[in-house]
């Protein structure tokens, strides 16, 4: 570490004549430091030299980590951002904001003191990527698995020393994560090929890891559960102190939450107007007494759409259904040139492994390495009953594919990989990510499917009301105005969800703070930019030029993106 800092100082002192050179030197030093201290992230982004290790988590390691972050912030603050080019200034803002967020988490959230997922997620992700990424050659895969397995017992022992309080909710999540890690570890031998001595050593490490994990699980449930309790999420003060670090300093919590509630009513009314004709085909005109009657009409209509036999999809044909849907969406987007044809990612469909722990029906994997020609795995959650029905109907599969593949997340990833900046690729703006996915679905409907029947539009708007409702409950839940049970009830009712759908959103808000609020702001911001862009261009407006402007400079914060797009 001392060598890295010596390099930083020498480079910066030697480049005083150029603020831009100083920033470039500092950012490169930070990236090297980041991958060294985050070896699982290095593996995730395709940096091969850290495959065999995990992040160091002892008290002294955390202190060194915090001190390094503080030094990077000091060095970065000494670079005059006004002397940077507009493009480099964006990277400066991204890096500075991310460093401040890391510093806040380490100083205020301090997850290693109460959240077992701090170490369990590191273990799971580190092994899962090595197990599933196809581009890792076998020698590196074996060496990486071997090194990481050896580290697990010590990591769990260190975690025991550092946890001083508990959150019952996170112990529950931790138990599920441990079960998933054990399942993953049991499958590792069939993923590896090496000499017998090495494989025997790995087998012994697997036995030791499973024993350590089961011991850790017992300790969580019997010992940690009796330590002082953390009142999650209230004790974390997410609704006020954390908000600017996760959302951005330009957004005010009160203003955001006020807009959320206003938007909820508007979207629900839109859904109702589309639902009523369908409802009246099988029902008498309802007698409206209160808002609940309006919601009941919508709920009945959504259930009616999902239960129609012609809309349902057999699990046995799910892969072909997804392929047909994606091909159809690609033809739609290309027929009007909505996105550049030569910037896209190859996508391979696969059933997710049983040990992949995700509440979502689909998930992208292996899209992080900055290689435009690499392939993305699109995991579909499998089900034991191969003759049964897939949980999503055909309309919902189209919506999901528009969001994640084309013209959604996969297209955004491809453009981000083409842009040269490593800082903005390493730390993409989460509000931009979420906003583009929602906009991608809206764009398909507005540009191509506007004359489709109301059922599609109802389900599209249901996706938006899910975002809005999740944003609302995060404001209430994080501030202690609503407990988890009441938040679940609210989101089920207001967003027309079943139990599993509501639980999936709650888990997101539990483990990935402000997921709903980020998506809501992203949805509002990108539509605001589109409206202003259309106004500026008038008759010269072209949707493909707008999309190109949004995508071509990487996944950057909206305050910077807006300047770039509207200056064109």
Regions found by a protein language model. Give the residues of each.
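Sec-dependent signal peptide recognition
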Residues: 2-8
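N-terminal maturation segment of proteins
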Residues: 17-568
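Hydrophobic h-region of N-terminal signal peptides that target proteins for export
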Residues: 9-17
């Amino acid at each position: 570490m001392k060598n890295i800092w010596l390099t930083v100082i020498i480079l910066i002192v030697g480049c005083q004549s150029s603020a831009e050179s100083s920033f470039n030197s500092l950012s490169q030093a930070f990236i090297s430091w980041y991958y060294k201290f985050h070896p699982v992230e290095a593996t995730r982004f395709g940096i091969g030299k850290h495959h065999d290790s995990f992040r160091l988590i002892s008290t002294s390691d955390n202190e060194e980590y915090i001190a390094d972050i503080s030094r990077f912030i000091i060095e970065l603050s000494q670079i005059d951002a006004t002397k940077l080019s507009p493009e480099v200034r964006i990277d400066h803002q991204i890096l500075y904001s991310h460093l401040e967020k890391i510093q806040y988490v380490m100083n205020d959230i301090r997850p290693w003191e109460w959240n077992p997922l701090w170490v369990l997620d590191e273990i799971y992700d580190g092994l899962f990527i090595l197990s599933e990424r196809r581009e890792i050659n076998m020698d590196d895969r074996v060496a990486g698995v071997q090194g990481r397995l050896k580290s697990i017992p010590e990591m769990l022992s260190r975690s025991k020393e550092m946890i001083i309080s508990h959150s019952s909710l996170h112990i529950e999540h931790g138990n599920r994560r441990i079960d998933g890690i054990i399942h993953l570890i049991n499958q590792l031998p069939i993923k590896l090929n090496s000499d017998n001595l090495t494989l025997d050593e790995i087998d012994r490490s697997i036995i030791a890891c499973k024993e350590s994990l089961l011991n850790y699980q017992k300790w969580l449930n019997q010992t940690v559960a009796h330590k002082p309790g953390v009142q999650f999420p209230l004790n974390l003060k997410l609704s006020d102190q954390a908000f600017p670090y996760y959302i951005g300093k330009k957004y005010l919590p009160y203003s955001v939450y006020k807009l959320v509630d206003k938007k909820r009513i508007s979207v629900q009314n839109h859904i109702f107007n589309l639902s009523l004709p369908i409802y009246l085909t099988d029902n008498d005109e309802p007698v409206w007494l209160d808002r609940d009657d309006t919601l009941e009409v919508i709920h009945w209509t959504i259930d009616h759409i999902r239960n129609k036999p012609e809309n349902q999809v057999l699990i046995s044909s799910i892969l072909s259904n997804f392929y047909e849907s994606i091909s159809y969406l690609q033809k739609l987007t290309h027929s009007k040139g909505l996105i550049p044809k030569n910037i896209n990612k190859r996508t391979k469909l696969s059933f997710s492994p049983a040990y992949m722990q995700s509440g979502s029906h689909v998930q992208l994997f292996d899209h992080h390495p900055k290689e435009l020609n690499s392939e993305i795995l699109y995991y579909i959650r499998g089900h034991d009953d191969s003759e049964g029905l897939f949980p999503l109907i055909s309309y919902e599969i189209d919506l999901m594919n528009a969001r994640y593949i084309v013209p959604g997340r996969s297209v955004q990833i491809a453009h981000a990989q083409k842009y040269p900046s490593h800082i903005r690729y390493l730390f993409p703006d989460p509000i931009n990510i979420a906003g583009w996915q929602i906009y991608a679905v809206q764009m398909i409907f507005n540009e191509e499917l506007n004359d489709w029947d109301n059922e599609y539009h109802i389900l599209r708007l249901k996706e938006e009301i899910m975002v809005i409702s999740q944003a609302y409950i995060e404001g209430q839940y994080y501030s202690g105005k609503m407990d988890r049970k009441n938040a679940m009830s609210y989101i089920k009712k207001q967003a027309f969800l079943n139990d599993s759908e509501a639980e999936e959103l709650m888990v997101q808000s539990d483990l990935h703070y402000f997921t709903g609020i980020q998506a809501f702001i992203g949805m509002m911001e990108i539509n605001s930019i589109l409206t202003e862009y259309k106004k500026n261009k008038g008759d010269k407006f072209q949707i493909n030029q707008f999309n190109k402007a949004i995508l071509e400079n990487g996944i950057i914060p909206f305050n910077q993106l807006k300047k770039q797009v509207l200056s064109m």
